[in-house]
Amino acid sequence: MSKLFIFFLLVALLAFVSSEAAECVAKGQNCIVGKSTCCIGQCIIKDHVLGSCE
């Protein structure tokens, strides 16, 4: 794979993660401030895999 392809893949992944995090916060599941046990990564995983971020 070319370095350019890998670069675009990383950019796309970053954009996806940030949009997911924004959606998570918008739903009232504030991953950064309100819930110390629910950082952004955990929030995305729990919300999509377990159906809850609590």
From Swiss-Prot:
Disulfide bonds join C24-C39, C31-C43, C38-C53. It is found in: Secreted. Keywords: Disulfide bond, Knottin, Secreted, Signal. Residues 1-21 form the signal peptide. Potential candidate for insect pest control through ingestion. Feeding leaves coated with this peptide to neonate D.saccharalis result in increased mortality and significantly reduced feeding compared to caterpillars fed untreated leaves. Expressed by the venom duct. Transmembrane segments: none annotated. One of its GO terms (cellular component) is extracellular region. It comes from the Eukaryota. The keyword Signal applies. Coiled coil: none annotated. Highly abundant in venom. The presence of a 'disulfide through disulfide knot' structurally defines this protein as a knottin. This endoparasitoid wasp peptide has a role in disruption of the cellular host immune response, since it reduces the capacity of D.saccharalis hemocytes to encapsulate foreign bodies. On the other hand, it shows no effect on the humoral immune response, since it has no effect on phenoloxidase activity. This is H-bracotoxin-Cf4.
